[in-house]
């Protein structure tokens, strides 16, 4: 997808540890056009304005051990101001590292000024 669009992020496996502590949320984002990640389970979906569903997040349990979480979301930095987005990312990191994700999701409290870009990077 080229350019920012308003989308609703929907968990396809709501009880997966990466999805703990958040429900559907809306953001403006730019994501890759429907890539296929072989053998991974689709985890996150967005619906385009025309009604087409696009998978934007996956999880993968490796046969020999290890885990992966991938998402095509997160293009604009401003999305890190969204608590649900931050929680999804941190939950994904914890789960991939084999660390138990709390039932309420990871703590992602951040002071607002810590999320501001320096003026020269805006």
What residue ranges belong to the model's regions?
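An acidic, glycine-rich "communication" segment
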Residues: 1-51, 63, 105-122
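Extracellular ligand-binding/catalytic regions of CAZymes and related secreted enzymes
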Residues: 49-54, 62-122
